[in-house]
Amino acid sequence: MNEDALIGLFSTPLYKSRVDVDPSINEEYLKSLPYFNFPDGTGACSRDQKILLNPKFESLKKEIDKHVNIYLYGALKIAQGKPKHIQSWITLHKENQASPKHLHSNSFISGGVYFECPPDCG
């Protein structure tokens, strides 16, 4: 007997929430950081590739870590191990720029915080 089934074996779960951002991390501050332009012209990236380890971002990192733990230990029911911060950066897109489709293949968890964006995007 042939029983067809669809199994979400390699699905990508998505966790969505809101995080509080320190008011000092404002547009003026974000624009003052050093960036390099992407070669394809789609935007720019902070030179600091571990931006969440910057003391200015300490409270944001704590917020993100809280949600990572909710996801890992609450939603996925991970029983052992501890996540390790590998990279964090800021991507800057100006009008008519967007991030092309891409993967973060070196990560078990990958996420984004949107500091400013139009309604119904991201």
Model-inferred region functions:
Residues 84:
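Active-site cores enriched in adjacent His and Asp/Glu residues with nearby glycine-rich loops
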Residues 87-122:
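Catalytic core of non-heme Fe(II) oxygenases with the double-stranded beta-helix
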Residues 1-81, 98:
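Non-heme Fe(II)/2-oxoglutarate
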